[in-house]
Regions:
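Active-site-proximal helices and loops of the catalytic beta/alpha 8
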Residues: 28, 34, 44-128, 161, ...
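Conserved, mostly hydrophobic/aromatic
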Residues: 25, 32, 43, 70, ...
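Substrate-binding/active-site clefts of carbohydrate-active enzymes
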Residues: 1-35, 57-63, 80
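Soluble or luminal CAZymes and related metallo-dependent hydrolases
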Residues: 17-25, 49, 53, 108, ...
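Substrate-binding clefts and catalytic carboxylate motifs of secreted carbohydrate-active enzymes
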Residues: 113-183, 198-202, 235
Length: 300
């Protein structure tokens, strides 16, 4: 018989319990690795895939190309079911996707702070500690972040949060310069335009800086997560490894704010300062946060 994914019959539902089907798919993967040198695969609607197939795919790819990444699209549920040592390396973090734009639009940073702590916090019950989920502010299936945010001053802040939080940051093409696009009820054409040429701007430069800072920070790439200061308009959290400690501070408000907390102590370097304007600051229980700002403070 013939089935389609969720009633879409142009998207055939394959029988992944049929050895011949599995062998064919693995041959396709092998071709793409050997002919084109791809480094990984994104598995669409991974929550629908047979678990034994994902186990077979994982072992096959690891033997063929060590370090090959398998990332699944998952919208809901427990990500641990498929992101583990036997199946996928990562999956899309839709819980925090929603939390990012909603926190800014509602001016309630408690929402994203709660989600991040629930997923990656210091307590043993936190559900995704040690995992690297794919994080994003938009993609080919949802309205672009520049069209969702009600205050455009929050656009760079959303990217600052994206690159400061745990996970694997993913940027959708065009959004690095703030392209807008609203998902229609019956099609996604507005989300997937053909650009004649790039449109780099200040947001692009800021994202490039975020990428460089994160790439060179073990704490931002691999560190633990812990909330330090939370208000409706401000959030300070800590990323830490044995060798590095970074405070990520976000002020979504339209005025300067001074955060007070006994943990805001010591000497820090502002990682997002320009190379010729490296700023060293000493905290004595307080941090002054400019309006609409993102700060990455590395303990020295």
């Amino acid at each position: 018989w013939y089935e389609g994914w969720e009633g879409h019959f142009e998207l055939v539902k394959l029988n992944l319990q049929n050895p011949a089907v599995v062998d064919y798919l693995l041959d396709c993967v092998k071709m793409w690795i050997e002919e084109f040198g791809i480094d990984g695969l994104r598995l669409d609607v991974a929550y629908c895939l047979d678990h034994n197939f994902m186990r077979r795919l994982r072992s096959f790819c690891e033997e063929l190309k060590p370090g090959f990444a398998l990332i699944g699209e998952v919208l809901f549920g427990d990500y641990n079911l498929i992101v583990n040592d036997e199946m996928l390396h990562s999956c899309t973090n839709y819980e925090c996707y929603k939390g990012i734009f909603s926190s800014f639009n509602c001016m309630n940073l408690f929402e994203i702070a709660h989600s991040l702590n629930r997923q990656f916090g210091p307590d043993q019950w936190c559900i995704y500690r040690g995992k690297h989920l794919m994080t994003f502010v938009d993609n080919h299936d949802v309205t672009r972040i520049a069209s969702i945010l009600t205050n455009k001053n929050h656009l760079p802040l959303a990217y600052g949060l994206l690159f400061g939080m745990p996970g694997i940051p993913c940027i959708y093409y065009g959004s690095e310069w703030g392209e807008e696009g609203v998902k229609a009820p019956d099609n996604d054409y507005a989300l997937r335009p053909c650009f004649e040429e790039p449109k780099p701007n200040e947001l692009t430069d800021f994202i490039k800086e975020l990428i460089e800072v994160r790439r060179n920070s073990d704490a931002l790439c691999n560190g633990s997560y812990r909330n330090v200061v939370i208000t409706n308009h401000q959030l300070i959290f800590e990323r830490r490894t044995d060798n590095e400690r970074v405070l990520v501070a976000i002020n979504a408000g339209d005025s300067e704010f001074t955060a007070g907390n006994g943990e805001l102590q010591g000497n820090f370097t502002e990682l997002l300062a320009n190379a010729d304007e490296i700023e060293n600051i000493t905290l004595n229980g307080q941090l002054t946060m400019p309006a609409y700002s993102v700060q990455f403070l590395k303990a020295v």
